[in-house]
Curated annotation (Swiss-Prot):
<comment type="function">
    <text>Inhibits all the catalytic activities of DNA gyrase by preventing its interaction with DNA. Acts by binding directly to the C-terminal domain of GyrB, which probably disrupts DNA binding by the gyrase.</text>
</comment>
<feature type="binding site">
    <location>
        <position position="9"/>
    </location>
    <ligand>
        <name>Zn(2+)</name>
    </ligand>
</feature>
<keyword id="KW-0862">Zinc</keyword>
<dbReference type="GO" id="GO:0006355">
    <property type="term" value="P:regulation of DNA-templated transcription"/>
</dbReference>
<feature type="binding site">
    <location>
        <position position="28"/>
    </location>
    <ligand>
        <name>Zn(2+)</name>
    </ligand>
</feature>
<comment type="subunit">
    <text>Interacts with GyrB.</text>
</comment>
<dbReference type="InterPro" id="IPR013088">
    <property type="entry name" value="Znf_NHR/GATA"/>
</dbReference>
<dbReference type="Pfam" id="PF03884">
    <property type="entry name" value="YacG"/>
</dbReference>
<dbReference type="GO" id="GO:0008657">
    <property type="term" value="F:DNA topoisomerase type II (double strand cut, ATP-hydrolyzing) inhibitor activity"/>
</dbReference>
<comment type="similarity">
    <text>Belongs to the DNA gyrase inhibitor YacG family.</text>
</comment>
<keyword id="KW-0479">Metal-binding</keyword>
<dbReference type="InterPro" id="IPR005584">
    <property type="entry name" value="DNA_gyrase_inhibitor_YacG"/>
</dbReference>
<dbReference type="GO" id="GO:0008270">
    <property type="term" value="F:zinc ion binding"/>
</dbReference>
<feature type="binding site">
    <location>
        <position position="32"/>
    </location>
    <ligand>
        <name>Zn(2+)</name>
    </ligand>
</feature>
<feature type="binding site">
    <location>
        <position position="12"/>
    </location>
    <ligand>
        <name>Zn(2+)</name>
    </ligand>
</feature>
<protein>
    <recommendedName>
        <fullName>DNA gyrase inhibitor YacG</fullName>
    </recommendedName>
</protein>
Amino acid sequence: MSDVTVVNCPTCGKPVVWGEISPFRPFCSKRCQLIDLGEWAAEEKRIASSGDQSDSDDWSEER
């Protein structure tokens, strides 16, 4: 007996089998994959941080 892992598509919530039969995993389709990429590119999604580091003295573009 083989265990099949099923995850929900992060874009639409549709169930996706985690395996070679699902080439866009964790997404259900290329469309959902591109929607997610567009959200990251438009900065609608971001990785949470502990604070605003834009004014940090540790970061400098000067060499």
